[in-house]
Structure formats: C-alpha cells, structure tokens
Amino acid sequence: MTRRDFIGGAAALAAVPAFARNPEDIRGVLLHWGHNMWGESLPDDVKSVKGGRLCNDHAKFDETLWRKVIDRMVERRMNLVVIDLGEFPIYPSHPELAVKGSRSADWVRGEVRRLKSLGLEPVPKLNFSTAHDAWLKDYGRMVTTKPYYRVCRDVIRDAAEMFDHPRFLHIGYDEERISHQKGFQCIRTDEVWWHDFLYFVKTVEDAGMRPWMWSDYGWKHDDFVEKCPKSVVHNNWYYDEWLDGFDLSAMKPDAKSRPLVELFLKLDKAGFDQVPCASNWCSPDRIKAKASNDGCMADMVKFCRANLSPERLKGFLMAPWAGDFDERDFLKTNFAGIDQLAAALG
C-alpha cells in the first residue's frame, strides 16, 4: 500500500487501514515530554490560583533520564512509545505555544529518528480534552470557534511532519466529564462535543494518520460506541482504582468499576480495534488500603486475552504516569511499569 493509497482510504473512511502487523503487536508505554495538560494557563504575573495549580512556564525535561527510560524499554522488548507533546515542541505553525526550554522541530525530528533506530515506533499525543488542554494557552479558552479549529488543525499537521508521518496520532480526550470540569464557566457537551470530536477524527485522518483516543467518554454515554467511527483506535483505561478487579460476575451491580470493564466488551462486540491500558499508579483508595497496583497489567492481559477477539486486540499500553523528572521516583515508576508490561506479555 502506498502512502497515497493510505491517505485516500482514510479520508474516505472506505476501509480501516491495517493497524498492526500481528495480533498483540503493540507493546507500548506512555511517556511525557510536555506536562501542561494539568493546570491553569494564566498571565505571567499571576503567581498562584486558589484550589488549583498553574502551568509550568518552562519545559520540565531531563534528557539523561529520558534516555535511561528509553533504554529500559528497548531492553524489555517494548516496540512503541506514545509521547505526550503538550508545550514541549516549538510547533512551526504556532511558536507562541512554546515555553522556556521548549525544543525545536529539528530536535523532535532527530529524536524520532533515534527512537526508530532503536526499534521503537514513536506516536505523538496531543490531548484535546477540555480537561487537559492548558498547553493550548489562550486557544484552550476558544473551544468550538474558528481560531480553535485552525490552531488544532495546524498542530496536528506539525506533529505529523515532525514525527515523519506516523501511523497514529493520539488525541487524548480523556476525563471529559463534569467531575473534571466543575470549575468551568462553559462545558462542551452533547451535540457540540460530538461535532468537535468528529472534527478531530477527520483532521487526523486527513493528515494521513489513524486517530487513537482514551475511551472513557463511553463509561457513561451509551451512544458512544454506536456513534464513534470504526477507524478510531481505543485506549480504554482501567487502573482498578477501587480494588474491584476484573471479574464482572463477582462485582456488585453498582460497582464503580463495572462500566469501565464492561466497555472493553462493548467495544469488542462493536468491532473496534483496542489497545487496553493499565497502570502501576496507585489511586487514593489503594494507598489507603496499602494495596499496590503492581498486578494491574497482568490482570488486564489475562482478562483481555480471555474475552476480546484476537484480531481486534492489537496490544497493550502501560501508563506509569511518572510526570516530574525527579530522578529516583521517575526512574523507579517508569522502570516498574515497563517491567510489569514485559512480564505480563511474556
């Protein structure tokens, strides 16, 4: 298949392009270059915000630690890395999104080439969830306007070019729910939510990539599975935050975890490709119970292999969520996540 054939097929939605070379081809880890997906983007002279936190005014990145984590991935036979971009690159089309220490497009291109030379497939991630788009700065307050659509389209194209036209682009879109938006004056929902989501799907496909997303909008929206285009790759994430496990027959009918686990089955039945995501991150409930989450990925692999169609189970993603580059915690958390995924997959 030529690149022209791929783009034409994706744009027309005539067929879903081949996702993986073999079943469970993806052995992936989520890592972060940018960190301004959590916080408030406010004027420089505002030094604090009540009940929240401000975005970083500089890139929080340690290249030495980054390379150590990448080396661990290679040692443990990982083959794909999803990279949260956020404010980290200097986007050629919108350099105003950069912060102090953001890296040039040439640096990104060089690192992408290096990762490929190590046998890793780099996948760019641009989180367009309104709960995680502070990296867009003022444009994040222009949701559903022409300037917003233009900027989002431009940075998607930039990511495609900097990553040498990758197979996928992760659009984020997690935690689009009231509990994460209760401080907002306006909330994107219902028809407007769908309008913007479908805009991102089409824009990613028009740029020659396949859209990849967090699936949690489907936990509480029954129409999600029906309306979502089949071209979207689903990252349903389940971290077993409330210690309910994966056994639906043992869960109470009103268990918080039930809709999360059930969504794996619904997506599979509807014919979606999936890359289920687990984590070694510990929720407050787990910390209170003094229960580690080191077995979450192994339990997920066992559940998914037993219950999902092999042809649609395209691999697994580990999300350690080791955000800050504090050497001890950063390496410990990422190494543990990588090792747990490697052990679970065998």
Short names for language-model regions:
Residues 62, 66, 104-108, 148-153, ...:
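Well-ordered, non-membrane alpha-helical segments in soluble/globular domains
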Residues 222-229, 235-280:
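Glycoside hydrolase catalytic-domain groove-lining segments
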Residues 23-31:
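Transmembrane beta-strand segments of Gram-negative outer membrane beta-barrel proteins
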Residues 25, 77, 163-167, 307-312:
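Short loop/turn motifs at secondary-structure junctions
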Residues 5-20:
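N-terminal export signals
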